């Protein structure tokens, strides 16, 4: 499988189109990559969606860089091409300026794929900096 080309890791910043953040794009907490991050505004239903490309179908490794400055976990559904494939819980990172990475496998189709991070509780998503897709 070769997502994005060359067998390398491809980064998709949350603040760059075609990514969609239904919260706000913010830059008030240091340590993020790029020009900002997706803040789900602590709301259920405020998701982050990424469009990623894969040259062949198969399993890819998804890395989600996040910050959760609360002491409450942020459970999330990872929806790939309309189907829930993972249900990670993003733990507290100690502050909104402390970023961590959660890693898990996701199935991708050949061509364009949508990956949506959808909160499952009223607390919403953690702040999402980017996702990276790597070959398996």
Predicted regions and their residues:
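Extracytoplasmic
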Residues: 1-136
